[in-house]
Amino acid sequence: MSQVAAESTAGLDQQFVGLDLKSSDNQNGGGNTESKGRYIPPHLRNRETSKGVCDKDSSGWSCSKDKDAYSSFGSRDSRGKPNYFSDRGSGSRGRFDDHGRNDYDGIGGRDRTGFGKFERSGHSRWSDRSDEDDWSKPLPPSERLEQELFSGGNTGINFEKYDDIPVEATGNNCPPHIENFSDIEMGEIIMGNIELTRYTRPTPVQKHAIPIIKEKRDLMACAQTGSGKTAAFLLPILSQIYTDGPGEALKAMKENGRYGRRKQYPISLVLAPTRELAVQIYEEARKFSYRSRVRPCVVYGGADTVQQIRDLERGCHLLVATPGRLVDMMERGKIGLDFCKYLVLDEADRMLDMGFEPQIRRIVEQDTMPPKGVRHTMMFSATFPKEIQMLARDFLDEYIFLAVGRVGSTSENITQKVVWVEELDKRSFLLDLLNATGKDSLTLVFVETKKGADSLENFLFQERYACTSIHGDRSQKDREEALHQFRSGRKPILVATAVAARGLDISNVKHVINFDLPSDIEEYVHRIGRTGRVGNLGLATSFFNERNLNITKDLLDLLVEAKQEVPSWLESMAYEHHYKGSSRGRSKSRFSGGFGARDYRQSSGSANAGFNSNRANSSRSSGSSHNRGFGGGGYGGFYNNDGYGGNYNSQAVDWWGN
């Protein structure tokens, strides 16, 4: 037994010696001659004869160092060295490698290729190997992505009228406006994407806002609904990011990643009041960041938080967010605003109406965001009442006030009709309007309550109309599906509450119907602004009865301002309402005074410290002075058609103006 055991032990020792690569190499003088019976694992066979070839070992791809600086995927090391992974013996397996390269080790990382895509491996670290590259150079095109982003765009048909829209810019040293996109340097990427988007001419707000933002001036812009405000701030912001690169934000992200955290530091932040508007801005940002290294993200309430966090962890340079969800992400440690250079508040008055002021101040003033004067801040909206201009005093530094068109007014591209309809007759009147509308035309019907939206949708469905509805009680998925069906024309009638009234860009809406008029005139402005967008012509019809007497005067002012036909009964009611209310003091409507309609610094005089009241630097183009708060003049000359009367059942009236 002892002899057998000894022989067995000797046999095992001999086999181990045969497996010892180093002793075997030494015995053979380091040559390639193999001992008889020596076992070589498959992954090590012919290793010595494969120098200069990338072999996949157990730790990843290991490439020879004499390979060209560009990998087969088009990615490039930031110092011209090849993009290869270290061996198991010296690699850090996904941890931060601080030895000679300021980047994550490739093992288990997500390597960013030349087109900005990510490759996942075992761990989820983010490796941006193009951090020192020139961000102003476009990446290779993608036919699939280009088709996805730019296939649905369309341009307006009434841009000639934009030349007559009055524009007023107030503030020190206002940069001159542009007439064409080519008049200002925005870089190769932006100009290419403008061409893909089929934008031929800038709108008035774009003509003035783009050079102001490019000069890094703070801006408060008040422009008509549907005038192109989104592109007015995205184009210059992205252009500047492409020129400046990521700066300290990328370095901070990497330093944070050393300790296993995945906090993102966006360079630009856009705040929006609603989920729908946030998604819309995000989609526009995707278009203008095409072929760039900038990665936009969007976060909003009512959607899966985990999925939004995963999307953020892939990288975020431009963030579009609703205030509530952004505060949540900041408290979770997923978002840091330490290096935010650009802050945009879109539909700022709507955010205040929805009670977001505490969250906005928490984001801007009580966290790590750079202070005003260091960051670049812009506020955009269709209306700017007193509360918003007071917010501007706190957030903006030496800003320029830009009033494009008649502030708080409606577009002349929209034909407005007001008809007297009793409450019980509304549904039958609505059916008459829908029957007069072409089958391919999109119609948006606004109601005041969620219950009313569901009820009207059921009624139209029973009448065999293809319709859908959205309101605040619907899930985010249901709302997105409803908007998709409406945009695509599968269900050309959308019944909505005010949740869809602000900021939604559904470009080919032909007809907006106020089944229920809102209680304030500003909501009316935003509702009818869903049609007649960016140069297109549209129609807005409002059902008026005794329940709407509170907005009679403001509605009359608005119709006069937009040079619309005014029913004689509405003029009479406004006259009576005016004298009934005169004994109670001056109207508090935003349209009765100049505060919300012009630069607060000019109307308040020297009583407000911190505001520049120098009127000599005001610049004006294409229009006359504003002498009624938002433009226009007296009532004279606009009431030539007193026979309007609101009787639209007559065959002599062509509803569409043909």
Curated annotation (Swiss-Prot):
Keywords: Acetylation, ATP-binding, Cytoplasm, Helicase, Hydrolase, Isopeptide bond, Methylation, Nucleotide-binding, Nucleus, Phosphoprotein, RNA-binding, Ubl conjugation
Family, similarity comment: Belongs to the DEAD box helicase family. DDX3/DED1 subfamily.
Claim: Protein transport is one of the keywords in the record: no
Molecular function GO terms recorded: ATP binding; ATP hydrolysis activity; RNA binding; RNA helicase activity
Keyword Transport: no
Modified positions (N-acetylserine) in chain numbering: 2
Residue numbers bearing the Omega-N-methylarginine modification: 101, 110, 590, 615, 628
Cross-link (Glycyl lysine isopeptide (Lys-Gly) (interchain with G-Cter in SUMO2)): 214
EC number: 3.6.4.13
Expression (tissue specificity): Found in heart, brain, liver, skeletal muscle, kidney and testis. Low expression detected in lung. In testis, expressed in all types of spermatogenic cells including spermatogonia, spermatocytes, spermatids and somatic Sertoli cells within the seminiferous tubules. Also expressed in Leydig cells and other interstitial cells.
Record-linked InterPro entries: DEAD/DEAH_box_helicase_dom (IPR011545), Helicase_ATP-bd (IPR014001), Helicase_C-like (IPR001650), P-loop_NTPase (IPR027417), RNA-helicase_DEAD-box_CS (IPR000629), RNA_helicase_DEAD_Q_motif (IPR014014)
Organism the protein comes from: Mus musculus (Mouse)
Residues where N6-acetyllysine is found: 56, 117
Modified-residue entries (Phosphotyrosine), positions: 104
Record protein name field: ATP-dependent RNA helicase DDX3Y
Chain segments annotated as coiled-coil in the UniProt record: none
Stretches with biased composition (Basic and acidic residues): 45-69, 94-129
Phenotype on disruption: Knockout males show normal spermatogenesis, produce morphologically normal spermatozoa and sire healthy offspring. DDX3X and DDX3Y double knockout is embryonic lethal. DDX3X and DDX3Y double knockout germ cells can differentiate into spermatozoa.
Residue span, Helicase ATP-binding domain: 210-402
Chain location of the short sequence motif DEAD box per the record: 346-349
Skewed-composition ranges (Low complexity): 603-627
Positions of post-translational Phosphoserine modification: 86, 90, 130, 182, 455, 592, 603
Short motif Q motif, span: 179-207
Gene3D superfamilies (alphabetical): P-loop containing nucleotide triphosphate hydrolases (3.40.50.300)
Domain Helicase C-terminal residue range list: 413-574
